[in-house]
């Protein structure tokens, strides 16, 4: 049956979501180029979309994890441990790539501006302390402030408690999870409009003029992220699944990375990743935990940002760096990156911590942070796209490897 009287509705239902997002992206660029005043006004649509994603993500994670654990049957296997290992290996590998690239293509900064009133963490111990305090946060406050470490802790605890509840209670949790998931699907259907508003307003406000003075630094940063996305991550996945990893890599970048690039929020992209995992047919008990956990600790992009900007400051100040110190920086950057979600300002405000390894004073380090905020239009977008798409990639790789191992047994 055809509906000639509704061609627009017919086109929307027949075109894939990714295709619609690409159309929204192009339309946003065109509007920003020719009608910048109008582009600034439609930015409100993008803000509404990101706010909707951020609003639904904490509730989705809480309900989904709690229902998944409560309904977990004895004997079912989850694959969280190998995924955690992949997260750590991926983050450390990204830091090593950033160190090598920074030595091969050293960047110089113009350190003159100040980013204003900020409070970077004082050391690694403070970052770890912040993470621990996040675990024992009040559950209501965790939901309100989108503290996903706290949300996970309470969801896991309640899920374990509800495993001893009646079948009626556990079925209610499953129905609640399905209801929240349906709301998420509705929100995600508005992604093309959201991307249109975000792209239009971003390019109308900043354009590319503000980035020209930092072209070399951006090339190193984005080059590292692309190298990790298309070389390092596929290599890690290949070692895990023993087949061509690129179909899976490209699917994750297309379906997850593209949305994350424009929302610039790993938390906002959690619903997108969970839906992608469902379409890939992954183990729900696994991905319902690994995806929100990955949004918190899987930070390859943050490790690259911290390392590249720190070594750019080191090169600018003429500080000599030996190999052991570079290795130590990789470790520190990896640990800092894992704690980036627990720090207001994310990876950029952890740069002073890494700079302290080289005796760089806080005043200079905060000027490096200011440079980070100037290039954040691209740096933050690319960082989030790499972080978020890798969550799905490593989850899928671990699930496939464990399934292959189980079938061979």
UniProtKB/Swiss-Prot annotation:
Protein localization: Cell inner membrane
Name of the protein in its database record: Serine/threonine transporter SstT
Keywords: Amino-acid transport, Cell inner membrane, Cell membrane, Membrane, Symport, Transmembrane, Transmembrane helix, Transport
Any one GO molecular function term: neutral L-amino acid:sodium symporter activity
Enzymatic reactions: L-serine(in) + Na(+)(in) = L-serine(out) + Na(+)(out); L-threonine(in) + Na(+)(in) = L-threonine(out) + Na(+)(out)
TM ranges: 17-37, 49-69, 83-103, 142-162, 180-200, 218-238, 301-321, 331-351, 357-377
The keyword Acyltransferase is assigned to this record: no
Family in the record: Belongs to the dicarboxylate/amino acid:cation symporter (DAACS) (TC 2.A.23) family.
Pfam family, one: SDF
